[in-house]
Amino acid sequence: MRQFDISRRLAYYGFMELQVELLKLIQQIRFPLLDVLFQAITITAEELFFIVLAAWFLWCGNKQLGYRVGFAFLVSTVVNPMLKNSFRLERPIGIEGIEAQRLHTAEGFAFPSGHTQGAAAFWTGLMSFVRRPWMYRLGVSMIALVALSRMYLGVHWPVDVLGGAAAGIVTVLLMNKLFDLASRRKNKFLLLWAVLPLAVGLFLVEDKNYVQPFGALLGFWLGYLLEDRYLKVEVAAVWWRQGLKMAVGLLGLIGIRVGLKLLLGTVFPSDFMISNLIRYFFIGLWLTVGAPYVFRNCNIQYKKNE
C-alpha cells in the first residue's frame, strides 16, 4: 500500500510543535477524577459499547435505524486502519511531558483516531435519523468528548481526532446516500458497493483491526438480506420480552465470540487473519439474523395478544 509520511509534512509546517504544546496544555488539568471520567468516555467509543447498542436497536428498538447506523459504523471502522496504514503517523506516546494512559487501546498508528472516527460515525448516524435538537446536542457532545478524551489520555494528536471526526462524518453521509438509493430502487444488493471495494484491503492491509470489522460488515450485510427476505421480525414487545431477548442474544454473542475463538484456535494460529474474519463474520450474522431467528423459534418474540 502506498504510504504518505504525514509526520514530515506536519513537522515542515510547524504543526507538530504546536500539537505537542496543545497536548501538554490539555494535560495540565489532569487529576484522578478526570482520569476516571475520560477513561469512561473513551470506553463509549469501543467495541463492546457499540455492539450492545447495535443489538438493542436491531432486536428491541428500531431495526431500520440499527441497519443504517450499523452499516455506516462498520464501513467507517474498516476504512480507519486502511487510512492509518497509509499515513503512518506515530502516536505522541513517549514524547517528553506527555503522559499516556489506557495504552491497550492505542494499537497501531495514530491518524486518524479510531475512537473518534467510530464515535463520529455512530452519533452522526443517529443524528441523521433522529432529527431532534436533543439528539444533535447529545451527538455533538459525545463526539467532542471522545475526541478530547483521546488527547487527554495522551494517545492521539489533535490532527488525529480532527481527521477521525471528518472521516466518520463523511462515511455516514456517503452511506446514507447509498441506503437511500437502495431503498428507492428496492434493491438491497446495491449495498455491496460499500462492501466489495473494501475486500481489496484484505490483500493490502495486514492488520486484524481491518479484518475483524470487515468480517462483521460482510456478515451484517448477508444477515440484513436474509432477515428481510425470510424473517421480517417485529422488534416491539413488552418489557420483559425485550429484556429476555437482550439476555439471550448477548449470551449467544459471547458464545460466538469466545467459543469460535477457542474452536478456531485449534485449527489456526491465534493471530491468523482468516480466523478473525470468520469469527466476526458470524458476529455480524448473529446480530442481524441469527438472534432474531432464535427469538422467533423459541417463542420470546413479540406476541399479538400481549
For each feature predicted by the language model, list its residue ranges.
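N-terminal transmembrane-helix/juxtamembrane module of multi-pass inner/ER membrane proteins
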Residues: 2-49, 80-108, 236-248, 252-256, ...
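Polybasic, low-complexity association/targeting segments
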Residues: 48-72
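Membrane-embedded catalytic cores of phosphoryl/pyrophosphoryl-handling enzymes
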Residues: 53-55, 67, 77, 93-261
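Tryptophan-centered motif/residue detector
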Residues: 58-60, 123, 286
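Hydrophobic membrane-targeting signal helices
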Residues: 59, 79, 147-148, 222, ...
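Membrane helical hairpin/interfacial module
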Residues: 63-90
